[in-house]
Amino acid sequence: MSITAERKQELIAEYATKENDTGSPEVQVAILTERINNLTDHLRGHNKDHHSRRGLLKMVGLRRRLLSYVQKEDRSRYQDLIKRLGLRK
Protein backbone atom coordinates (compact mmCIF):
# COMPACT_ATOMS: atom_id res chain seq x y z
CA MET A 1 0.00 0.00 0.00
CA SER A 2 2.83 2.41 0.68
CA ILE A 3 5.66 3.10 -1.72
CA THR A 4 9.07 1.49 -1.36
CA ALA A 5 12.19 3.43 -0.49
CA GLU A 6 13.61 2.69 -3.95
CA ARG A 7 10.50 4.04 -5.69
CA LYS A 8 10.61 7.15 -3.50
CA GLN A 9 14.26 7.75 -4.45
CA GLU A 10 13.34 7.36 -8.15
CA LEU A 11 10.60 9.98 -7.77
CA ILE A 12 12.93 12.34 -5.93
CA ALA A 13 15.58 11.97 -8.65
CA GLU A 14 13.02 12.53 -11.41
CA TYR A 15 11.25 15.60 -9.96
CA ALA A 16 14.04 17.29 -7.98
CA THR A 17 14.89 20.82 -9.05
CA LYS A 18 18.47 20.53 -7.75
CA GLU A 19 20.66 17.91 -6.13
CA ASN A 20 19.53 16.61 -2.70
CA ASP A 21 16.15 18.26 -3.23
CA THR A 22 13.57 16.29 -1.26
CA GLY A 23 11.26 19.04 -0.05
CA SER A 24 10.34 21.04 -3.13
CA PRO A 25 6.62 21.13 -3.93
CA GLU A 26 7.22 19.18 -7.15
CA VAL A 27 8.82 16.28 -5.29
CA GLN A 28 6.14 16.33 -2.60
CA VAL A 29 3.35 16.30 -5.19
CA ALA A 30 5.00 13.43 -7.10
CA ILE A 31 5.31 11.31 -3.94
CA LEU A 32 1.76 12.12 -2.88
CA THR A 33 0.46 11.21 -6.33
CA GLU A 34 2.18 7.83 -6.14
CA ARG A 35 0.71 7.19 -2.69
CA ILE A 36 -2.75 8.34 -3.83
CA ASN A 37 -2.64 6.01 -6.84
CA ASN A 38 -1.60 3.05 -4.67
CA LEU A 39 -4.31 3.76 -2.11
CA THR A 40 -6.93 4.19 -4.83
CA ASP A 41 -6.09 0.72 -6.16
CA HIS A 42 -6.35 -0.67 -2.63
CA LEU A 43 -9.76 0.90 -2.10
CA ARG A 44 -11.10 -0.60 -5.33
CA GLY A 45 -10.72 -4.04 -3.74
CA HIS A 46 -11.55 -3.00 -0.17
CA ASN A 47 -14.41 -0.57 -0.57
CA LYS A 48 -15.40 -0.67 3.12
CA ASP A 49 -11.98 0.41 4.37
CA HIS A 50 -13.14 3.81 5.58
CA HIS A 51 -10.02 4.54 7.64
CA SER A 52 -7.88 4.35 4.52
CA ARG A 53 -10.43 6.39 2.58
CA ARG A 54 -10.07 9.19 5.13
CA GLY A 55 -6.30 9.10 4.70
CA LEU A 56 -6.77 9.24 0.94
CA LEU A 57 -8.94 12.34 1.23
CA LYS A 58 -6.34 14.02 3.45
CA MET A 59 -3.60 13.25 0.92
CA VAL A 60 -5.70 14.58 -1.97
CA GLY A 61 -6.33 17.80 -0.03
CA LEU A 62 -2.64 18.23 0.73
CA ARG A 63 -1.73 17.64 -2.91
CA ARG A 64 -4.34 20.17 -3.99
CA ARG A 65 -2.88 22.80 -1.64
CA LEU A 66 0.66 22.13 -2.87
CA LEU A 67 -0.46 22.37 -6.50
CA SER A 68 -2.24 25.62 -5.72
CA TYR A 69 0.97 27.00 -4.22
CA VAL A 70 3.01 26.00 -7.28
CA GLN A 71 0.39 27.55 -9.56
CA LYS A 72 0.53 30.86 -7.67
CA GLU A 73 4.33 30.94 -7.63
CA ASP A 74 5.13 29.89 -11.20
CA ARG A 75 2.47 29.01 -13.75
CA SER A 76 4.91 27.32 -16.16
CA ARG A 77 6.25 25.00 -13.43
CA TYR A 78 2.66 24.11 -12.57
CA GLN A 79 1.77 23.31 -16.19
CA ASP A 80 4.90 21.18 -16.57
CA LEU A 81 4.22 19.31 -13.33
CA ILE A 82 0.63 18.37 -14.07
CA LYS A 83 1.61 17.33 -17.58
CA ARG A 84 4.41 15.07 -16.29
CA LEU A 85 2.16 13.53 -13.66
CA GLY A 86 -0.85 13.25 -15.96
CA LEU A 87 -3.19 14.85 -13.43
CA ARG A 88 -5.46 17.07 -15.48
CA LYS A 89 -6.68 17.17 -19.03
Curated annotation (Swiss-Prot):
Q: Which GO terms describe its biological process?
A: translation
Cross-referenced PROSITE patterns: RIBOSOMAL_S15
Is RNA-binding there in the keyword field?
yes
According to its record, what are the GO cellular component terms? cytosolic small ribosomal subunit
Q: Say if the entry is tagged with keyword Secreted.
A: no
Q: Which UniProt keywords apply?
A: Ribonucleoprotein, Ribosomal protein, RNA-binding, rRNA-binding
Q: Tell me which domain of life the UniProt entry assigns to the organism this sequence originates from.
A: Bacteria
GO MF annotation: an example: rRNA binding
**One Pfam family this sequence matches:** Ribosomal_S15
InterPro entries assigned: Ribosomal_uS15, Ribosomal_uS15_bac-type, uS15_NS1_RNA-bd_sf
* Self-association state and partner proteins as the record states: Part of the 30S ribosomal subunit. Forms a bridge to the 50S subunit in the 70S ribosome, contacting the 23S rRNA.
Stated role = One of the primary rRNA binding proteins, it binds directly to 16S rRNA where it helps nucleate assembly of the platform of the 30S subunit by binding and bridging several RNA helices of the 16S rRNA. Forms an intersubunit bridge (bridge B4) with the 23S rRNA of the 50S subunit in the ribosome.
Give the family from UniProt.
Belongs to the universal ribosomal protein uS15 family.
Return the protein name: Small ribosomal subunit protein uS15
